[in-house]
UniProtKB/Swiss-Prot annotation:
Native source organism of the sequence: Euglena gracilis
Keyword set includes NAD: no
Functional note: This is a component of the ubiquinol-cytochrome c reductase complex (complex III or cytochrome b-c1 complex), which is part of the mitochondrial respiratory chain.
Residues annotated as transmembrane: 66-86
Keyword Lipoprotein: no
Boundaries of the annotated transit peptide in chain numbering: 1-30
Annotated protein name in UniProt: Ubiquinol-cytochrome-C reductase complex subunit IX, mitochondrial
């Protein structure tokens, strides 16, 4: 029962412990991590550097811009076909007399 009370109290006070506003009076196992050690993966993970992060952001932005522009071009084409039909030019009769 005492372990459960400690765990509940620790869960409630975890933000204060992380911020350094309180010092625990008893040894705590889960003070700094919200996930138990058994659930953590053993593979080492290193965060990407700033260059990799910015490269990823730029690539995603350009990809999304390209898709958006292609989509709008397709929509404009469909609307133009519906409004104007398949003809985009006016036929000229070469044999007609010039208008005066």
């Amino acid at each position: 029962m005492q372990t459960h009370v400690r765990r509940v109290a620790l869960q409630a006070l975890r933000p204060c412990l992380r911020a350094g506003l309180m010092a625990p009076k008893f040894p705590v196992r889960f003070a700094t991590t919200a996930v138990s050690g058994e659930l953590l993966t053993k593979t080492p993970y290193t965060r990407p550097g700033y260059a990799a992060q910015w490269t990823c952001l730029v690539v995603l932005f350009l990809k999304n811009q390209l898709l958006m522009r292609l989509f709008f071009a397709f929509v404009a084409y469909v609307v133009a076909m519906k409004v104007f039909g398949a003809r985009f030019h006016v036929d000229h009769d070469e044999d007609a007399t010039p208008a005066e």
